[in-house]
Amino acid sequence: MRAYSPLRCLAAVIACEITALAGPFVVFPKAGQLPSPDGRFLVRNVARAAPSSQIVGISESLVLEETGSGRSRKLCDYLGVAAVAWAKNEFIIMTQYVSRRTSRAVVFTADGSRQPVTIDQPLLTKIVPVNLRPQLRENDHVFVEVSRVEGETLALRVWGYGKHDPDGFRWNCLYSLPTGGISCEEPGSDAK
């Protein structure tokens, strides 16, 4: 539990920074649950039950429950902490803090009509312009955070530091859900 304390602090600070861009972010597992704005759905945390002698790589799960019918479906398993928010009543947006060195963005639809979209360092390394790839490959701390959904576009913040960028780098990116295309820019510069 103590090992995740700095990670939880980081998640809480980031969640507070981007609250205005989507519904309020809550940090799981501490939050326990998050209702949709219209009250039709509830995202719940489910602790994984395992013998204390067994080492388990997956510590928690997120489940989406329809409040009217009581039906539920598992969204994902996660390790560490996850900052989760609703975008309108349609999307559940999550930044999963996988370790102290990386995070990834995941988007789920409330109605289950699409597969979840996961955007992480390996995916970005394949789809960003070639001139940006060294920042992803050569830095050992890379964080991908989803801030909001605008129609069919995800707004992301990508940042990190390491050997390539000891003072860090920061991008604002737009990811197209239908095409999988991305555009990124450094704050205060032209799009790349």
What are these regions (language model features)?
Residues 1-11:
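Bacterial N-terminal signal peptides that target proteins for export
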Residues 9-20:
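Bacterial N-terminal signal peptides
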Residues 21-76, 181-189:
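Terminal domain-start segments
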Residues 32-40, 83-92, 143-154:
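Blade-terminus and WD-like Trp-Asp/Gly-His loop motifs, strongest in beta-propeller folds
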Residues 39-56, 90-98, 152-160:
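Short beta-strand elements that form the blades of beta-propeller/WD-repeat-like
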Residues 52-62, 101-109, 163-174:
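Structural motif
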Residues 71-85, 89:
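Blade-loop segments of beta-propeller domains
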Residues 117-138:
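Surface-exposed loop and turn segments in beta-propeller and other repeat-based domains
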